[in-house]
Structure formats: structure tokens, C-alpha cells
Amino acid sequence: GGYIRTDAIYDFNQLGNINQFRPESIPTPNLDVSNYNMAARASRLTLESRTDTKWDVLRTYIEIDFVGPGNTTELRLRHFYAQLRNILVGQSWTTFHDSDVIPETADFNGPNSWIFQFNPQVRYTHRLAKGQTVSISAEQPSSGIPRINPVTAQPVSSTSPLPDFVVRYRYETDDYHFNTAGLFRSVGGVRSSGQSDHVFGYGVMASGLLRLWGRDNIVFQAVYGEGISRYFIDPKNLNLDAGYDSSGLLKAQPAYGGYAAIQHFWNE
């Protein structure tokens, strides 16, 4: 399966990123140059299988798009996982993410504060009661820190001694759903001298969807934490999980964001 999507963008004052609205890429001072761009990078290909086993149905899912690095059209793996009953193994949305509250914006990037991360992981989901589930996962970590300690001038290599751990609770009815999650991680690196610097990072997230009349709905998401910038779509590649203070010590950086959106259907 999949679909073809083509974006045509005319920018009156050219952004640093010609394909998406990424505030972190806006040049300073602004460029007084217009630009037109057309791309089909957001098109997707999917493949799903369901196989009967003696335990239950084994589901596998693969999804790719063409949003490669540096505005290229290289293949990008979004999902590649196997799921049997309550256990998921492979790459998918981080458990810290709520895929039901993504606003349908004209720009593929979406709100710059929403949680956007595909992680290799092992996830277990337990049904508590009707409409209530709890999920726990151990996920691939990655420490976004400066590559140079500005005080000692030593090169630093990022390291992550532990998986990122996520716990999520979800409550859902026919009229609304509410989702909250906690993220716990270790962020750090090793200096060229061999000294290791690691700090604790955490995040909390709340999101939800409320159905109005017909198919209209309101969605929201709010996030706060320290050492979690890689989970936000806009600053995820800026190495802002942690930074060095004036004493050369590594400190987790606070990060927070949120949005709300309403979706209205003009016809059936």
C-alpha cells in the first residue's frame, strides 16, 4: 500500500529548509529571496502481513518514505516491526508519542513542538479495563550533546549507557481519549581524556482528542522535560539534550512545548 503526495511551496523569504517549515532553519538575518520548490518526498510505501501461529496472529509492518537527510529523496525507514498479542518488537513510533493527535497541516513538518521520533524498541501493552491500557517500552537511546567541551576544549563522543524507558497510560471512549506518558533516559558522552559525563533526563507528556459534532474534533499535546530535545521535531538534530556549564559540567537542558488544533469537515 501507500500513497503519492506532492508538495508545492512558494516562499517569499527563503527558509533554510526548502521542503518543510523548520523554525530552527530560519536564517538570521532573513534572506530577501523568494523560492519555489516542488517535491514528492512525503510519499509512502507500506507492506503488511498477518500470519496465523499457534499463539495468535503475527502481524508485521513496514513503512518507508523518501524524506532523506539534507533535503534528499533517499529512502527513510519509518516503521519495521513485528507484533504478537501485546508485544511489539522493531522500529515504530516512540511510546512517548500519540499518533492520534497529529494535526492535518498543509506543511508536512506539522507543529514544531510535537513529539516526532521513530525508535527501535521492545514494547509491552497491558489492558487494564475497557478503554484503558498501560504500555512500557525500552527504546534505542541517542544523546544529543555538544561535540566539544567549551571549557576544556576536549572533543566529546556521545554515549548512552541505558535504553530510553517509557511508560504510557491511555484512556479511550467513543467521544474522546486521553493519553499521558513518562520518559526516563541517560544522556552523556565521553571526553577524549576518557572521562565520562552523564546526566539524567526525563519527560512528561499529556495529549488528547475530543470529538465535537459530526467528525469535527479538537486535539492537544503538552510536553515538559529535561534532556529530551531529540524527541521534538524541530530541535531534534541540534544536539540540545544537554550542554556544558561554565565549570565544564554537563547539564540536562529543559525543553517544553505544546499545541492545540481543531479540525472541521466542510462536507461528508
Language-model features: where?
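Outer membrane beta-barrel
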Residues: 1-20, 28-145, 161-162, 166-177, ...
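Flexible, solvent-exposed coil segments and beta strand-coil junctions
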Residues: 24-28, 99-106, 146-150, 181-188, ...
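Long hydrophobic alpha-helices with heptad-repeat/coiled-coil character
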Residues: 119-170, 236-268
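Detector for outer-membrane/organellar transmembrane beta-barrel domains
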Residues: 172-268
